[in-house]
Amino acid sequence: MTILICLAGATGWAGSALARGIAQTDDIAIVAAVSRTHARRILGDVLAEPGLTCPLYTSAQEALAHPCDVFVEFTKPEVARSNVLAALGQGAHVVIGTSGLTDADYAEIATAAEDHQRGVLAVGNFALTVVLLQKFAEIAARYIPQWEIIDYAHADKMDAPSGTARELAFRLSKIRPSELSVPLEQIQGEVETRGARLTGSQVHSIRLPGYTISAEIIFGLPDQKLTLRHDSGSSAQPYVDGALLAIRKVNTFVGLRRGLDNVLDLT
């Protein structure tokens, strides 16, 4: 049975790569897509991919006039929440690849998913190495009480911290908050230089030319430290593989789940 999807952000870096990946599958089809830049054109014409014959629309609300099984969100954080809620209202399951959504946004989305009895899979980063980084960090946090998170990205990335860093901090908050030897209120000097306190973790965001996407977490004990790091290359292929898996699995549960590991067997 073919999974019909609506793809928001279809001509962006990740969305266009996913669209091309979908064109190579025989069990997923794009019935409508969103691209404000190329609205009213055919997706395949824009991407030079003849097999993609769906129309492009300005908004998710327009695109959702086409019935779909799964709505895939790859736009911007300022519109992602409303797009997801609209898709749930139309009875679609949702895969979220957009970073920058807050815990408050996710709380609202979780409620809507339960109300509509649909699955939502939110993945800050679809790469397998990120999934493993998160798992290894959760193990380390049980034994090492102090850590800090650093995310690196190109100079033009608007959201901070990255979805990967935000998701990592959220996951570790379920284990315990990172201890601070010197409480923030006792810092002498500019406290902002210690980073942001996000769900119990100190998080630092670096935005400079020369970076693509990297995430790092450093755990510290007396006379020893542990560093876990993920680095992305310029190809979107790791994200495509993860997103295809998410599309195929998001209808297997009800409610919000955060992280690709929720549909992987990592036991």
Where are these regions (language model features)?
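Extreme N-terminal starter segment of soluble prokaryotic enzymes
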Residues: 1-5
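C-terminal substrate-binding/catalytic lobe of Rossmann-fold NAD(P)-dependent oxidoreductases
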Residues: 6-8, 13-65, 145-267
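Residues at the C-terminal ends
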Residues: 24, 65, 89-91, 115, ...
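Hydrophobic beta-strand scaffold residues
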Residues: 30, 56, 94-95, 119-120
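Beta-loop-alpha module in the N-terminal Rossmann-like domain of NAD(P)-dependent dehydrogenases
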Residues: 60-62, 66-89, 100-105
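Rossmann-fold NAD(P)-binding glycine/threonine-rich loop
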Residues: 85, 90, 98-120, 136
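Rossmann-like NAD(P)H-binding beta-loop-alpha module
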Residues: 132-144, 160
